């Protein structure tokens, strides 16, 4: 829990830092592999990859995934027409197995998540979708239904008071509801999707992702990495390299979101001291 983490910090059992490289095991998150490779190139080190029985090679690319195929698939599973950048995002995710997709508010992240979920459901994979709040659990479930899916037959919601044990292929949950659960609970999941990943607490996210040992397919979605409660490199390490799908100003130009005008009111006044906060407020507004 958050209090337990704080106690460990105060008692000096933990210095408050998340370490991406484990000096004891010599392991680093595979999502940071591109940075390791760049480090080797910069320092003229040689390197080689050894194939894993389960994961294959870390730079595995699914060549059979085509952009046209993804486009046709997204049109076939949804009554809403996907936008070009949404197709691009889903294509990039399915092609590389691991991605941190950065897409701003109102860009339609739920449609991209829905498309990825539908693809892996058809592949008979079990999927864990993790979100930061109970309202987002309900919103995601509702969005899937709005897209025309028989969501009740495939999805199960978990948050305070909800049953955690289920045979449903897709689980939508808050991270708070599952991060204390034992590793055995996570064994059946081969796909994990984190929405609004920047809102997760680092230690809790690391705990969840660390228990998902058999989850080969990992996708994080976030609107921004600025002001994140979790460092960008932690998110990339856990999910994969970041990929910016589209910017807010591009959405405005295309008419997908309302245009924004910002008027800055700059008040110039000499420095003045006040006896109370209320006096200062009255001075500012009069």
Region spans (language model):
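Conserved Walker A/P-loop ATP-binding site and its immediately adjacent core
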Residues: 111-115, 119-146
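Interdomain "pre-motor" coupling segment immediately N-terminal to P-loop NTPase/helicase cores
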Residues: 7-60
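Walker A/P-loop
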Residues: 96-118
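Conserved interdomain linker/interface between the two RecA-like ATPase lobes of SF2 helicase motors
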Residues: 246-286
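Post-DEXD/H (motif II) to motif III coupling segment of the RecA-like Helicase ATP-binding lobe
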Residues: 198-261
């Amino acid at each position: 829990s958050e209090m337990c983490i704080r106690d460990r910090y105060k008692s000096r059992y933990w210095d408050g830092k998340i370490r991406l490289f484990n000096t004891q095991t010599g392991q680093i998150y595979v999502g940071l592999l591109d940075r390791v490779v760049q480090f080797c190139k910069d320092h003229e080190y040689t390197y080689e990859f050894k194939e894993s029985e389960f994961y294959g090679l870390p730079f595995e690319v699914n060549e059979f995934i085509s952009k046209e195929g993804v486009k046709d698939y997204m049109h076939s599973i949804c009554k809403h027409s996907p936008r070009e950048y949404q197709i691009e995002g889903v294509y990039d995710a399915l092609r590389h197995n691991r991605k941190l997709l950065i897409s701003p508010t109102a860009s339609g992240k739920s449609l991209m998540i829905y498309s990825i979920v539908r693809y892996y459901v058809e592949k008979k994979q079990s999927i864990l979708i993790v979100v930061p709040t109970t309202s987002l659990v309900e919103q995601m479930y509702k969005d899937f239904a709005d897209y025309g899916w028989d969501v009740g037959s495939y999805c199960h919601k978990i948050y305070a008071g909800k049953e955690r044990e289920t045979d449903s292929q897709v689980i939508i949950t808050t991270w708070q509801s599952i991060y204390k659960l034992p590793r055995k609970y996570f064994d059946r999941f081969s796909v994990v999707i984190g929405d609004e990943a920047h809102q997760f607490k680092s230690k809790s996210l690391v705990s969840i992702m660390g228990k998902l040992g058999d989850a080969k397919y990992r996708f994080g979605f976030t609107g921004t990495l600025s002001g994140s409660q979790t460092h960008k490199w932690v998110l990339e390490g856990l999910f994969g390299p970041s990929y910016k799908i589209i910017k807010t100003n591009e959405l405005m130009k295309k008419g997908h979101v309302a245009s924004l005008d910002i008027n800055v009111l700059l008040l110039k006044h000499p420095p003045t001291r006040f006896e109370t906060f209320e006096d200062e407020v009255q001075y500012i507004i009069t």
